């Protein structure tokens, strides 16, 4: 937009500083800037504008676009610093993390080095607003990956558009490029909006769902000569202020619950567009750029550090929090975070002057393209090769704690009924007696359910995290978006004369291996329907995964109750996670925070479902939730393979954290049958996470491994026989 020989705009660098500051404040947990993630959207628009302007100027001055030279410049500009941060994070993070977390970090690094990090995190359906730096030290590479994908594809679009009408003149070439860009922007924006409305998991990281933001910047660069006429000395300052205000309003008013990107992304994107259009000093008569707010004083210089600061700040925060936790430094989370932010800014300044600029401006690299591509290949492949070597070296040093256990060795040798009727006060748990129950024969364990018992050494390669009940996956497990009831989910003895209905969320799912074996042994049919994060209740909940009220859970519960009207069974077993008390919402979809409101909402919802099921099936048994570990058990065991007791935790307190829900249920229905298997999950206090036979109990903080669940089959044989089939 400038007619001068220099195309540098200090206001854009100043805007870069504002953008990175918003991102850093958001990542630092400053609640006032809950929408600070829009800073990335500002970067996207700026990138599209600058890159397109660069390509157009080259074509207008030389009559061609040298793609080889373009990609060589991108390599010099982006890869050296990105690789430096990647390598530093791998070394320090690998030292601080558990072996299991280290494996995940190396995988993240491979994707980041190849600029596919957004696909990696999108495939994991990660929620950007729900991930903290300690969970993924390289999550921030998602945006760099999308930008690099744009940098690879966009020059090709420009070249093809210009080549297609090369004989028709510059005006038609520009018109065609403008038309093609508008089509891409419209299509990409439509995808982004559809993803936001449908809450498609992982869509935050979608490449095509983000290209429209860079496309808007490209449109501004293509239409720059025409847009200059919109400027006047009187409208520049107020319109730039409005654009900046739009960005800041989004940063302070958006949050984790904002469907993004979609319509909401228009605010920061259009705000950035206004700054780009009206911030340009297009004529000598316009006021000097020095009075522009974004070009004031140190802002442009700080903005030139934005790329380096963005790269350093996220892993710095994560490493600081990990170190504070590992060595118990006694620093508050806020202190550790802001210390890391300060350090990351220092690293940004140093690396900008010692790595980024020297390599970008190196005469030897700019004189020939070949060294640039050799450098780029080396920087991109180093983390990939290094990761493989690191994992290979780590696997050779794995320590075995115990041989894989035979399931019969870990099954309780004696089990006493612990189903209890609860009135207005919770009845005491029955102490185990000497009622003998034979452990299931090994032949009862299906090979699809259990290949072998997990041992602590498996924690180092995520075998524990993947030890899920295979028989409960697939069509019989409804995901977050599902509302239909799956047919024919039959476990246990399919021809059994007695039938138990087992329903609930993933905390029912982790009991299904035990129920399946108990059903086979005792001649019970077990009909099961499960939906992730969705308890069987008439109360409405918030979905952390979908970042909105969980309407699909409401609909699924309604469909489930309707489907059960045509089912014949001897009773219903319900299991659910205790943390649902943190997710109840009112009629307006607002999360309930007061215990009284939580209890009332849960009581009303439970009474509605309990009454319907009791009237239909007679006996309804609600399982108490199993203890929740204060740490990820698989991670802990991977760090302490020879000292597994370090991963135990006090069962009392954790085991009864569902008290609010349970007491509300009792008050709602007067009397409730409940079943508690905590004494068999935690035979001692602290609750140990590895059995005497070497079977790991938990695969994360709350879910039992499929292997350990099978060892509970004798327990369920006794408890369910007493609950559903014994007459008094």
Model-derived segments and their meaning:
Residues 1-390, 726:
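Membrane-interface helix/loop caps of multi-pass membrane proteins
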Residues 256, 324-338, 345-353, 357-728:
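Extracellular/periplasmic envelope-modification machinery, especially enzymes
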């Amino acid at each position: 937009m400038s007619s001068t020989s220099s195309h540098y705009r200090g206001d854009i660098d100043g805007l870069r500083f504002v953008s990175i500051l918003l991102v850093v404040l958001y990542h630092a947990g400053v609640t006032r800037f809950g929408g600070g993630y829009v800073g990335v959207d500002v970067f996207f628009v700026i990138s599209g504008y600058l890159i397109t302007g660069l390509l157009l100027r080259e074509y207008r001055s030389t009559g061609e676009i040298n793609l080889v030279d373009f990609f060589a410049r991108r390599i010099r500009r982006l890869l050296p610093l990105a690789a430096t941060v990647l390598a530093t994070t791998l070394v320090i993070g690998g030292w601080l993390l558990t072996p299991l977390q280290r494996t995940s970090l190396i995988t993240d690094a491979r994707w980041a080095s190849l600029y596919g990090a957004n696909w990696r995190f999108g495939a994991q359906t990660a929620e950007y607003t729900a991930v903290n730096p300690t969970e993924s030290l390289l999550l921030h590479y998602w945006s760099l990956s999308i930008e690099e994908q744009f940098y690879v594809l966009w020059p090709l679009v420009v070249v093809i558009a210009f080549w297609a009408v090369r004989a028709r003149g510059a005006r038609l070439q520009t018109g065609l490029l403008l038309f093609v860009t508008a089509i891409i922007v419209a299509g990409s924006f439509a995808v982004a909006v559809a993803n936001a409305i449908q809450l498609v998991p992982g869509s935050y990281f979608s490449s095509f769902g983000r290209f429209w933001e860079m496309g808007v910047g490209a449109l501004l660069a293509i239409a720059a000569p025409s847009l200059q006429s919109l400027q006047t000395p009187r409208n520049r300052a107020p319109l730039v202020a409005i654009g900046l205000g739009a960005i800041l309003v989004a940063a302070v008013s958006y949050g984790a619950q904002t469907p993004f990107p979609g319509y909401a992304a228009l605010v920061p994107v259009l705000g950035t567009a206004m700054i780009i259009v009206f911030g340009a000093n297009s004529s000598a008569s316009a006021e000097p750029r020095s009075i522009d707010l974004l070009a004031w004083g140190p802002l442009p210089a700080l903005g030139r550090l934005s790329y380096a600061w963005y790269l350093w700040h996220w892993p710095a925060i994560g490493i600081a929090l990990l170190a504070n936790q590992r060595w118990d430094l006694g620093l508050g989370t806020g202190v550790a975070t802001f210390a890391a932010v300060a350090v990351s800014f220092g690293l940004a300044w140093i690396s900008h002057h010692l790595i980024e600029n020297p390599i970008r401006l190196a005469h030897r690299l700019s004189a020939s393209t070949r060294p640039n591509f050799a450098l780029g290949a080396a920087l991109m492949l180093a983390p990939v090769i290094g990761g493989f070597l690191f994992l290979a070296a780590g696997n050779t040093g794995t320590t075995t704690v115990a041989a894989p256990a035979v399931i019969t060795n870990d099954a309780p040798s004696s089990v006493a009924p612990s189903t209890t009727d609860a009135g207005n006060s919770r009845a005491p748990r029955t102490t185990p007696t000497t009622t003998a129950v034979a452990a299931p024969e090994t032949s009862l364990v299906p090979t699809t359910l259990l290949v072998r018992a997990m041992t602590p050494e498996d924690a180092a390669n995520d075998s524990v995290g993947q030890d899920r009940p295979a028989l409960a996956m697939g069509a019989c497990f409804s995901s977050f978006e599902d509302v239909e009831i799956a047919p024919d989910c039959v476990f246990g003895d399919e021809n059994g004369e007695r039938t138990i209905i087992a329903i609930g969320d993933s905390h029912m799912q982790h009991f299904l291996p035990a129920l399946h074996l108990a059903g086979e042994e005792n001649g019970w049919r077990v009909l099961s329907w499960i939906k992730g994060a969705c308890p069987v209740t008439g109360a409405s909940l918030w979905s952390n995964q979908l970042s909105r009220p969980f309407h699909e859970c409401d609909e699924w519960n309604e469909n489930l109750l309707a489907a059960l009207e045509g089912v014949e069974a001897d009773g219903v077993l319900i299991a659910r996670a205790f943390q649902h008390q943190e997710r109840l919402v009112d009629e307006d979809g607002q999360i309930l925070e007061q215990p009284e409101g939580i209890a009332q909402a849960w009581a009303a919802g439970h009474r509605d479902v309990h009454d319907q099921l009791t009237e239909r099936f007679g006996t309804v048994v609600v399982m108490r939730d199993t203890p929740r570990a204060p740490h990820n058990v698989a991670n802990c065991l991977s760090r302490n393979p020879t000292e597994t007791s370090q991963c135990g935790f006090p069962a009392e307190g954790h085991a009864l954290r569902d008290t609010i829900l349970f007491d509300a249920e009792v008050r709602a229905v007067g009397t409730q049958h409940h079943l508690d298997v905590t004494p068999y999950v935690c035979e001692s206090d602290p609750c140990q996470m590895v059995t005497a036979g070497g079977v790991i109990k938990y695969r994360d903080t709350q879910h039992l491994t499929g292997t350990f669940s099978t060892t509970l089959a004798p327990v369920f044989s006794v408890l369910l026989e007493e609950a559903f089939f014994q007459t008094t």
